[in-house]
């Protein structure tokens, strides 16, 4: 992947000091996330075109494609957005066992002032998990499932099947 064409997607690949990643300001972090979304859109649309051309089967993807572009390339009944309360996304970010999240957590703990580093990183997370962004997804016109700790995985699948008309 070319750094000039995809500077945000190649940012972590070319990073010399991972401490720089967790030391970014909320403005820098938000700009990077927005840039990743734009760059992923280009690649993911090409991948989807290729997949669609090779099969007649339904294709399910977890995507970074923006809501605006999804409205251009799909109809409302073919997209599902899964949302968690923004506070959960921020406060419980490191509770998940994902290797990437645990790697970032360890980086933050190794910072000279780990408490300050953690506060800064949570501010970055707050920025990209803002109520404004949440409402943009909520009011996108696409199907939305909001996180409910009392809902089982089977119940979530049943909701998804119903929304996509797969249970007919």
Predicted regions and their residues:
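NTP-dependent small-molecule kinase module
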Residues: 127-168
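A glycine- and Lys/Arg-enriched "phosphate-lid" helix/loop adjacent to the NTP-binding pocket
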Residues: 78-129
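ATP-dependent small-molecule kinase phosphotransfer cores
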Residues: 2-58, 64-65
